[in-house]
A protein has these predicted regions:
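Extracellular/periplasmic carbohydrate-active domains that bind, remodel
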Residues: 1-351
């Protein structure tokens, strides 16, 4: 139980606490457990509105759904192909992906509502050398959960995960898609050219994101990072409406780190470091070359309603680079941004 008396908003007094009494909409991620019958099972917690704290405890799992692991899941082990995983998904199975690195010759394609893809350990998905699309493609269906996975770019692909193939009017109010505890890395693994156009693309409406770490690598194996080596335009692109994201970490991308075009978006806590390594100002100009730098958080000019809370944006620049704005949003009454800060930590650049 959260002691709300211990926390108070204090930014108006020079403090650094942002307190939000309840979470507007959330679902905890599924987890593995052993039932009273000795069988492995997966519990999918229920969707919560205006909730506070974790929805389960040691003595009470709370509301939700229990799924038998062996009957309802396919347990993925290293060496299993993307083609075979997709056959299991088509057959109606969920996936529990065990620790290992999985080079995917084709995207894992989720077409059935309420499908779960759950990783344990450092289950890592890699779009293969001949897979220029993505690691996971989720169709615009209700209730899908993607949780506890690492996505690693070793070659070239459009995205690392894509939810919805395009923007539509379809809503998922009662049973939204959940993406939780997902980690994304572009570069750093091997000394070779790596490219992803945009790491995470959300086109469906009502998506819930709970903890993303999206990282264009700034260090790793020698020869694996550099402005022309590991290239990516955007970390996160949100085109869907009514998307809510909690705990967003997004760093070092070469254009807008986060680019939000959907209406009624909400973001709770954002940490972002701009790229270290732009060679010169001419490489880092937005708005068709008319504005110095790229905003770390950009809400498109046509958006009318957006809310965001508790942002920390900073830079460590190797070269003399100017960034005009760390955040860019439309000047409209429906745009509300609370508790924003930025800072230049060190390096040759100025902000």
């Amino acid at each position: 139980e959260v002691d709300i008396k211990a926390y108070q908003n204090n930014w108006d007094k020079g403090g650094n606490v942002t307190f939000i009494p309840t979470t507007p909409i959330i679902r905890e991620k599924p987890f593995l457990f052993i039932g009273d019958d000795g069988r492995y099972k997966v519990f999918r917690p229920a969707l919560k509105h205006e909730h506070k704290g974790v929805s389960y405890s040691r003595t009470d799992m709370g509301e939700g759904e229990i799924l038998d692991l062996l009957n309802e899941f396919y347990v993925v082990k290293p060496g299993v192909s993307a083609e075979y995983m997709n056959k299991q998904l088509v057959a109606g199975k969920h996936l529990l992906i065990t620790p290992g690195m999985y080079e995917l010759s084709e995207p894992l394609h989720v077409t059935r509502p309420n499908t779960i893809i759950l990783g344990i350990g450092w289950a890592t998905l890699i779009p293969g050398e001949k897979n220029s699309d993505t690691a996971i493609l989720v169709e615009d269906v209700d209730g899908v959960t993607i949780a506890s996975l690492m996505f690693d770019a070793h070659y070239t692909s459009n995205t690392l995960i894509q939810v919805g193939t395009e923007k539509t009017a379809q809503r998922h109010t009662q049973n939204p898609i959940l993406l939780t505890d997902l980690f994304f890395r572009i570069g750093g693994f091997r000394p070779a050219k790596v490219h992803v156009d945009r790491a995470v693309e959300l086109n469906s409406n009502d998506v819930i994101g709970d903890h993303f770490w999206i990282w264009r690598a700034d260090h790793g194996v020698r020869g694996s990072v550099g402005w022309e080596i590991n290239t990516t335009r955007n970390g996160l692109v949100v085109n869907g409406d009514h998307v809510t994201i909690y705990g967003l970490f997004n760093e070092h991308f070469q254009e807008y780190q986060t680019y939000w075009t959907g209406e009624h978006g909400r973001a709770y806590f954002y940490q972002c470091e701009t790229p270290y390594d732009a060679p010169s100002q001419e490489y880092y100009m937005s708005e068709n070359g008319t504005r110095t730098g790229y905003a770390a958080y950009k809400v498109a000019d046509n958006v009318n309603t957006h809310e965001a809370f508790a942002f920390g944006i900073y830079d460590v620049l190797h070269n003399e680079i100017m960034i005009e704005n760390s955040i860019e949003v439309p000047d409209k009454t429906g745009i509300r941004m609370y508790h924003m800060c930025n800072n230049t930590l060190s390096g040759g650049g100025a902000k």
